[in-house]
Design a protein with these regions (language model features):
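Charged, low-complexity surface patches
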Residues: 13, 87, 97
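Auxiliary, metal-adjacent structural segments of Zn-dependent hydrolase domains
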Residues: 16, 21-69, 83
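Phosphate/ribose-recognition catalytic cores of enzymes acting on nucleotide-derived substrates
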Residues: 1-18, 47, 65-66, 75-78, ...
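Short alpha-helical functional segments enriched in proximate histidine and acidic residues
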Residues: 23, 27, 92, 96-100
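A generic secondary-structure micro-motif detector
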Residues: 10, 83-84, 94
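Active-site scaffold of zinc-dependent metalloenzymes
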Residues: 52-90, 100-114
Length: 114
């Protein structure tokens, strides 16, 4: 995977994100459908995903829509096999959805989603 061109990496991760969303259990799938999920080709060392916005139920109707960014090149570089990449994309997506649902890092770690 690391030898692929950057746009191929982004396309691959976009497909994996779509597959992950389709197979999420409720209520995670419904939460994912409320979010703008973007796959970015920027190489961000040590950062696979980022949640930006106000967590669900925290109020502030004036806030921008909640967004998750998945960093395709960082994931592809660190997880070169398809199986490892598929697993990590799903794990990253679930982790960031957890932030949207109001979970902090210790909550996520307690659920095995660090």
């Amino acid at each position: 995977m690391t030898d692929d061109a950057p746009d191929e990496q982004v396309a691959q991760v976009e497909r994996l994100v779509g597959e992950a969303i389709r197979t999420l259990p409720e209520p995670l799938r419904s939460a994912a459908e409320e979010l703008l999920i973007v796959v970015d080709g920027t190489r961000r060392t040590g950062l696979y995903g980022l949640f930006e916005g106000v967590p669900r139920g925290a109020g502030d109707a004036e806030a921008l829509p909640p967004r998750i960014t998945i960093y395709a090149r960082a994931l592809a570089a660190d997880f070169p096999s398809r199986a490892a990449l598929t697993s990590e994309v799903r794990k990253t997506l679930v982790h960031e959805i957890g932030h949207y649902l109001g979970l902090d890092e210790s909550d996520l770690a307690g659920r095995g989603l660090e």
